C-alpha cells in the first residue's frame, strides 16, 4: 500500500514540478521579504543582489533550542503566520500541515478539538500531542489568543520528538509567542466584529404528516391507545385540518439566533539598548447560535528580555487568562432529557397540553424549556510564569536554567431546574452543584550547550545535556444541594445552597504526577553536507510502581544535503535537496496516577452512604480499577525517510515523507467480570502499526511587483493496523449513545484498523409475500429469516429486515459484521493566496476523503422505539404504512398495493438497531476561510503616522461539499476512547461566520 501511495505522489510531484518550471521561466521577478513576524521570530540568512532578496535559510525552534532549517534531520513542519482572521488556534491549524489532523468534535464554543499527529498510535489511550508554549509544557492551546502567536512548529518523527521522551508519542507542537526584536516602540491593534448563522437544517415531518404518523402508531398499539389519540387530535378524517397548521420548528427556535462575536487585541513591543519587552491584551466575546450560549475571554501577556552583559541574560514570560462560559450546550453526554438537539428534532410540533403524561409516553422534553432550566456557568482562570537565565562564559559554551509555574482554577456552577433529568430524579425539584477544580504545574529545567568545533570551518559539533523536573498537582471539591423551592432562580440557588438539602461533599486531592528526566543531544555536521544527530532521554514517572518508573527513549537521524555536492552546487535551478532518515523511540504515560496500587474512594451521594440509627456515615470503597503493579510505559518506535527539495531560490518547495510507527505495550483499558469486584483494569497489552505518506508543496506561481499568486498544498495518507490485543483476536467497544440498547457497536480486531463500526447489514424490509395471514395474524413463512428476537417483538410486513450472515435463519449477535470504518483514506489542505496591488485574497480549503460517520441521529429519528407522539425525520414520509385510505388497518392485499412504491421500512419498532443504513460516507471538501483585504497605501498612512492599515472581510465555513445527510460530516461525539470515533448524536451544529476586521500597526 505504501508503494502505491508513493507511486501516486511521484506522479503528482512530476506534474507539479513541470508546471512550476514553466511558470518560473516566464516569471523571474524578485520576491521582496516583508513579513515582520518572520523577522521577529527567527533570524534568517539572505543572499542579495541589486534586484533580488531571497530567504535561503532560517532558524526554527526545536526541542530545547533552535536549528537552521537546512540542517534539520527530523520531520518538522512550520507555520509562521497564523491567520489573524481566526479567533481559535485549533481551527487556524486545520489542514495547514501534512499529517496534522484537527477535527472539531462539534460546533460551538464547547466543541473540543481532536488533534492528532500522523493519526495517533494508542487505542484507548490519549493520542493528543505534547504542547510546548515558549518552552513550557501545557495541556492544550485552546485558550491562547491567535494574535499573540508568532510561529508554530509541528514535530512528527522520533528525531524531532525523542528529546521529549515519555510525553511525545503523539508528536510535539511548539508554539512561540511574539517578542520584541527591533529597536524602538512597535504597537499593533486588531479589531474584529462578526456574526454566525446556522444554515444546514434537518427536515422533520410536517404537522399534518406528524398527526397521520401518530395516528398510525396508536392504531398499531391498541384500540385504547387509538381512542386516547383521537380524543385529543380527532379522527382520521379530521386530521386534514393540520395541513393548514404552521410548522413549529423547534430547531429553528433553539438555534435560530444569529451569533455575534467580537475580538480586540493590542500588542506593544519595545526595545532599547539591551532590554526588550512585550505587553499584549486580547479580548474575545462570542455569543453562539444556541439560545443562552456565550463565552468571554480576557488574555494578558508580558515578556521581558534583558541582557545584563555578554555573559549573562534573562528572559521572563508571564500570561494570564480569564474565561467565562454560559450555557450547557447540547449536552451530548447526558441523558435524553438534556440532549437539546435530540429533543428539538423529536418533540411534537402540535399542542400537547391535553395529552396525558406526554413526556413519559414520548420520552421527549420541550427543548426550549429544558435549555432555559439547565443553568451552567463555568469560570476559568489560568496563569503561567517562567524565568530563564542564560550564562555564556565563553563563545562555545552556554548554560540555561528555567523555572516556571502554571496554574488553573475552574469553577463550574450548575443548577438543574424543573423538567431536567436531574430534577426529575428528585421529585422534579431543582438541584444545584458547585465544582471547583485546581491544577498546578511546577517545572525546572537546566540545559548546557557546548560547541567544541565552533572555530573549525567545515566541521560542526553541538552537544546538549540537560535535566528537567515537572510536578503536577490536582484537586477538586464538589458541593451539591437538592430539593430547592421552585420559586428560586439558578443564581439564588447557587448563592444559598443551604436552602436546599445539602448532600455529602465530594472532594479529592489526586496523587502528584511527577516526571524527572535526563536528556542529551549530539549533532555533527561536515561542511553542512552530511549531518548526523543522536538524542537520548530517560524519564522517571510517578504513575508507575517503583520498579517500572524509568523509560528510555533514544533516537538516531542523518541527513545528506545533496544540493551541496559539487556536481549540483552550482545548478541555480536547485536551491535545496536534502535526504533524511530517522529512527527512535518515544513514550506515552497518559493514564491516571496510582493505577498500580489499591485506591479507596468515598461515595459522593447519599445513596452510597451508610445509614445507622438515622445518621448518615461515610465509608470507603475500592475504586473501579483493579490495581496493576506491572503497568508501565507505552512505547512507540518511529522510522522516517524524508526528502526536501527547493527550486529557483525556494520559490518551489517540496517536502516528502514516508514513515512507519510501531507501538508496543499499549495502555489498554480492559473490562473485568463483575465477580472480580472491579470494573476495569489498565494493562500493557497489544501493539499497533501506523504507516503513511505525506507530501507538502509550496509554489510561488507568479511573483511580479503588483501581482503575486502563491499556492500551498498538502496531503497525507495514513494506515493504522492493530498487530496484537494481548492474546485475544477481537474486542468489542461501545459508543454508549443508546445506553444498553446498542452495545458493541465498534470492534477492535487484530490485523485491522481502529474505528471499525460493528453492526448489522441492512437488507430492506419484509413484504406481504414473506408471511402467511391467519385470523388477523402474520406468520413468517418457513425459510424466511426472522428478526423477531433482535427487534424485541413480532415482525410483520414492513418491518426492518437484516441480513443473515451465518445462514442459521435467525438474526442475532452472531450476524454482526463490520459495516463502516471511520479512518479516512487521505486528508489535506489547499491555500490559494493572491495579491493585486494593495488588495489581498486568500481562500483556504481542507478535506477528508473516506472515513465513515456513524449517524446515530438517523437511527433515533426514524425509530419509534417503544414510545408514542415522537416526531420523525422527513425520511419516513415514503415509508411502509399499515393504514388504508379510511384510516383502518389494511388487509394483506391492500397493504401490498398501498406500499408498492414504499421507500423504506416502517419506523414502528420496539428498539434501536445499528445497521448499515446509518453509516454514511463522511468525505468532505470545506472552504474553511475566504478573506478579502485591502492595505492602505503608505503615502496615506505616513501622513497619519501609521506604519500599516489593513481592512478585511472574511467568511468561515462558507461551503462544505459532502454527501453526508447530517448537519456536518466533521463530527465525533461520544468519544469515551479513541476506539469509538465519528459518532454523530445530538451534536452542536457548525455555523457559518462572517467577520469584518481592522489591523493597524503604529
What are these regions (language model features)?
Residues 182-248, 288-382, 400-516, 564-637, ...:
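Surface-exposed loop/interface segments of Gram-negative outer-membrane beta-barrel transport/assembly proteins
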Residues 177, 266-270, 302-306, 385-391, ...:
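Residues on the lipid-exposed face of transmembrane beta-strands in outer-membrane beta-barrel proteins
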Residues 191, 281-287, 532-541, 583:
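Transmembrane beta-strand segments that form the barrel wall of outer-membrane beta-barrel proteins
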Residues 295-307, 549-559, 947-959:
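Short secondary-structure subsegments characteristic of cysteine-rich extracellular domains
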Residues 274-277, 311-314, 396-399, 456, ...:
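Repeated loop/turn-to-beta-strand initiation elements of outer-membrane beta-barrel proteins
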Amino acid at each position: 500500500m505504501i508503494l502505491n501511495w508513493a507511486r501516486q505522489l511521484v506522479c503528482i510531484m512530476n506534474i507539479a514540478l513541470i508546471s512550476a518550471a514553466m511558470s518560473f521561466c516566464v516569471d523571474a521577478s524578485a520576491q521582496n521579504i516583508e513579513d515582520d513576524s518572520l523577522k521577529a521570530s527567527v533570524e534568517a540568512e539572505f543572499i542579495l543582489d541589486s534586484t533580488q532578496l531571497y530567504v535561503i535559510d532560517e532558524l526554527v525552534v526545536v526541542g530545547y533550542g533552535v536549528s537552521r532549517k537546512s540542517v534539520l534531520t527530523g520531520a518538522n513542519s512550520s507555520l509562521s503566520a497564523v491567520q489573524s482572521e481566526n479567533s481559535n488556534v485549533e481551527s487556524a491549524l486545520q489542514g495547514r500541515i501534512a499529517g496534522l489532523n484537527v477535527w472539531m468534535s462539534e460546533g460551538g464554543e464547547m466543541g473540543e478539538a481532536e488533534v492528532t499527529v500522523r493519526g495517533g498510535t494508542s487505542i484507548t489511550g490519549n493520542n493528543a500531542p505534547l504542547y510546548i508554549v515558549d518552552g513550557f509544557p501545557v495541556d492544550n492551546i485552546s485558550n491562547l489568543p491567535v494574535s499573540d502567536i508568532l510561529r508554530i512548529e509541528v514535530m512528527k518523527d522520533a528525531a524531532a520528538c525523542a528529546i521529549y521522551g515519555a510525553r511525545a508519542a503523539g508528536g510535539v507542537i511548539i508554539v512561540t509567542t511574539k517578542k520584541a526584536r527591533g529597536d524602538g516602540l512597535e504597537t499593533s491593534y486588531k479589531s474584529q466584529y462578526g456574526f454566525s448563522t446556522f444554515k444546514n437544517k434537518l427536515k422533520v415531518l410536517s404537522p399534518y404528516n406528524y398527526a397521520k404518523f401518530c395516528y398510525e402508531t396508536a392504531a398499531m398499539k391498541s384500540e385504547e391507545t387509538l381512542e386516547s389519540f383521537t380524543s385529543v387530535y380527532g379522527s382520521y378524517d379530521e386530521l386534514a385540518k393540520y395541513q393548514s397548521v404552521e410548522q413549529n420548528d423547534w430547531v429553528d427556535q433553539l438555534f435560530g439566533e444569529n451569533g455575534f462575536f467580537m475580538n480586540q487585541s493590542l500588542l506593544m513591543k519595545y526595545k532599547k539598548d539591551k532590554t526588550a519587552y512585550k505587553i499584549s491584551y486580547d479580548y474575545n466575546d462570542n455569543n453562539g447560535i444556541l439560545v443562552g450560549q456565550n463565552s468571554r475571554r480576557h488574555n494578558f501577556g508580558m515578556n521581558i528580555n534583558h541582557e545584563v552583559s555578554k555573559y549573562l541574560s534573562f528572559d521572563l514570560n508571564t500570561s494570564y487568562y480569564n474565561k467565562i462560559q454560559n450555557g450547557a450546550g447540547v449536552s451530548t453526554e447526558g441523558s435524553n432529557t438534556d440532549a437539546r438537539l435530540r429533543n428539538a428534532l423529536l418533540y411534537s410540533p402540535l399542542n400537547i397540553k391535553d395529552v396525558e403524561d406526554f413526556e413519559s409516553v414520548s420520552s421527549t422534553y420541550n427543548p426550549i424549556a429544558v435549555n432555559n432550566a439547565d443553568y451552567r456557568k463555568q469560570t476559568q482562570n489560568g496563569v503561567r510564569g517562567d524565568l530563564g537565565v542564560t550564562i555564556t562564559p565563553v563563545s562555545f559554551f552556554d548554560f540555561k536554567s528555567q523555572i516556571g509555574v502554571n496554574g488553573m482554577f475552574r469553577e463550574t456552577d450548575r443548577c438543574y431546574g424543573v423538567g431536567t433529568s436531574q430534577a426529575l430524579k428528585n421529585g422534579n425539584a431543582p438541584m444545584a452543584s458547585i465544582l471547583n477544580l485546581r491544577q498546578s504545574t511546577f517545572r525546572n529545567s537546566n540545559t548546557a550547550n557546548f560547541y567544541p568545533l565552533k572555530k573549525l570551518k567545515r566541521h560542526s559539533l553541538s552537544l546538549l545535556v540537560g535535566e528537567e523536573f515537572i510536578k503536577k498537582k490536582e484537586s477538586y471539591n464538589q458541593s451539591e444541594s437538592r430539593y430547592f423551592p421552585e420559586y428560586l432562580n439558578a443564581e439564588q440557588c447557587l448563592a444559598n445552597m443551604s436552602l436546599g438539602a445539602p448532600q455529602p461533599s465530594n472532594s479529592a486531592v489526586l496523587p502528584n504526577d511527577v516526571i524527572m528526566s535526563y536528556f542529551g543531544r549530539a549533532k555533527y555536521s561536515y561542511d553542512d553536507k552530511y549531518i548526523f544527530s543522536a538524542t537520548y532521554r530517560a524519564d522517571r514517572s510517578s504513575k508507575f510502581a517503583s520498579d517500572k518508573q524509568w523509560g528510555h527513549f533514544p533516537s538516531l537521524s542523518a541527513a545528506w544535503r545533496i544540493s551541496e555536492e559539487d556536481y549540483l552546487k552550482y545548478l541555480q535551478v536547485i536551491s535545496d535537496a536534502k535526504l533524511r532518515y530517522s529512527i527512535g523511540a518515544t513514550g506515552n504515560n497518559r493514564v491516571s496516577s496510582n493505577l498500580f496500587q489499591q485506591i479507596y474512594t468515598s461515595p459522593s451521594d447519599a445513596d452510597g452512604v451508610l445509614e445507622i440509627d438515622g445518621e448518615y456515615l461515610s465509608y470507603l470503597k475500592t475504586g473501579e480499577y483493579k490495581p496493576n503493579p506491572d503497568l508501565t510505559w507505552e512505547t512507540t518506535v518511529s522510522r522516517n525517510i524524508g526528502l526536501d527539495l527547493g527550486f529557483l531560490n525556494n520559490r518551489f518547495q517540496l517536502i516528502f515523507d514516508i514513515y512507519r510507527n510501531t507501538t508496543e505495550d499499549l495502555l489498554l483499558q480492559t473490562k473485568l467480570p463483575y465477580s472480580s469486584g472491579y470494573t476495569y483494569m489498565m494493562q500493557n497489552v497489544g501493539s499497533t502499526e501506523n504507516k503513511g505518506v505525506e507530501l507538502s508543496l509550496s509554489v510561488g506561481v507568479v511573483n511580479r511587483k503588483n501581482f503575486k499568486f502563491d499556492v500551498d498544498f498538502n496531503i497525507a495518507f495514513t494506515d493504522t493496523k492493530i498487530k496484537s490485543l494481548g492474546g485475544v483476536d477481537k474486542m468489542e467497544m461501545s459508543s454508549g449513545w443508546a445506553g444498553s440498547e446498542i452495545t458493541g457497536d465498534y470492534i477492535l480486531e487484530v490485523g485491522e484498523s481502529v474505528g471499525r463500526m460493528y453492526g448489522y447489514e441492512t437488507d430492506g424490509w419484509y413484504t406481504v409475500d414473506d408471511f402467511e395471514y391467519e385470523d388477523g395474524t402474520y406468520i413468517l413463512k418457513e425459510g424466511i429469516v426472522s428478526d423477531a428476537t433482535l427487534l424485541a417483538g413480532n415482525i410483520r410486513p414492513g418491518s426492518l429486515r437484516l441480513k443473515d450472515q451465518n445462514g442459521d435463519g435467525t438474526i442475532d449477535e452472531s450476524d454482526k459484521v463490520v459495516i463502516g470504518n471511520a479512518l479516512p483514506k487521505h486528508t489535506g489542505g489547499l491555500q490559494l493566496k493572491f495579491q493585486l496591488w494593495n488588495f489581498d485574497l486568500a481562500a483556504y480549503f481542507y478535506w477528508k476523503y473516506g472515513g465513515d460517520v456513524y449517524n446515530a441521529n438517523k437511527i433515533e429519528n426514524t425509530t419509534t422505539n417503544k414510545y408514542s407522539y415522537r416526531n420523525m425525520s422527513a425520511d419516513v414520509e415514503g415509508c411502509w404504512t399499515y393504514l388504508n385510505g379510511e384510516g383502518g388497518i389494511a388487509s394483506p392485499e391492500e397493504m401490498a398495493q398501498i406500499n408498492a412504491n414504499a421507500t423504506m421500512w416502517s419506523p414502528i419498532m420496539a428498539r434501536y438497531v445499528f445497521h448499515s443504513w446509518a453509516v454514511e460516507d463522511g468525505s468532505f471538501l470545506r472552504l474553511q476561510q475566504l478573506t478579502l483585504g485591502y492595505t492602505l497605501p503608505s503615502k496615506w498612512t505616513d501622513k497619519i503616522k501609521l506604519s500599516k492599515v489593513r481592512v478585511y472581510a472574511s467568511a468561515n465555513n462558507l461551503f462544505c461539499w459532502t454527501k453526508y445527510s447530517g448537519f456536518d460530516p466533521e463530527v465525533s461525539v461520544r468519544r469515551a476512547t479513541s476506539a469509538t470515533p465519528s459518532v454523530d448524536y445530538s451534536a452542536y451544529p457548525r455555523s457559518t461566520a462572517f467577520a469584518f476586521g481592522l489591523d493597524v500597526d503604529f
